[in-house]
C-alpha cells in the first residue's frame, strides 16, 4: 500500500513536472494524461481514507479475495481507491515514457540522460508492463468478493 502511494506521487505530479525540465523539453507528450494522473491521485487518497470511516477495510496488508469478503462499503471503497490509484500510475507512466522517448532536446542523447531520467523511464516501463496484473487483481477483488467458495 505504501509503495503504491509513493510510486504514484513520484510518477504523477512530481514526475510529470520534473521530466521535461531534466530532458530539455518545453512540454510533456500528453498534457491531458498529465492532468488526469495529477487529479486521480488526491481523489484516490480521499477514497482510501474515507474507507476508514465507513467501517474500515479489514484485509490487512493483502487484498486477496478470501480476505476481502468483508461486507460493507469500506472494502468497496478500498478496492475502488486502489483501482483509481493504478489508473493514475498508468496514465503518468505512459506520459513519462512517451515524453522521454519523443521530446528530448536535440543534443540530448541516451548517454546524456541523467540517472533520474533513466530511473523514471525504467519505472514507467515497469508500470506499463504491470497493467495486466493490475486489471487481473481488480477483476479478482471485485468479482470474487461475493463468491461463496471462500465461506467457512
Please identify what each model-predicted range represents.
Residues 1-152:
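Membrane-embedded and interfacial regions of multi-pass energy-transducing membrane proteins
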Amino acid at each position: 500500500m505504501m509503495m503504491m502511494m509513493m510510486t504514484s506521487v513520484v510518477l504523477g505530479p512530481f514526475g510529470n513536472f520534473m521530466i521535461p525540465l531534466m530532458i530539455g523539453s518545453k512540454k510533456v507528450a500528453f498534457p491531458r494524461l498529465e492532468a488526469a494522473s495529477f487529479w486521480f491521485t488526491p481523489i484516490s487518497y480521499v477514497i482510501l481514507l474515507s474507507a476508514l470511516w465507513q467501517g474500515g477495510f479489514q484485509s490487512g496488508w493483502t487484498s486477496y479475495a478470501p480476505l476481502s469478503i468483508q461486507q460493507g462499503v469500506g472494502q468497496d471503497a478500498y478496492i475502488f481507491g486502489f483501482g483509481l490509484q493504478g489508473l493514475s500510475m498508468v496514465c503518468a507512466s505512459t506520459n513519462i515514457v512517451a515524453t522521454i522517448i519523443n521530446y528530448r532536446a536535440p543534443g540530448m542523447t541516451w548517454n546524456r540522460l541523467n540517472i533520474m531520467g533513466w530511473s523514471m523511464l525504467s519505472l514507467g516501463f515497469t508500470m506499463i508492463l504491470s497493467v495486466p496484473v493490475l486489471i487481473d487483481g481488480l477483476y479478482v477483488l471485485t468479482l470474487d468478493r461475493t463468491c461463496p467458495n471462500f465461506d467457512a
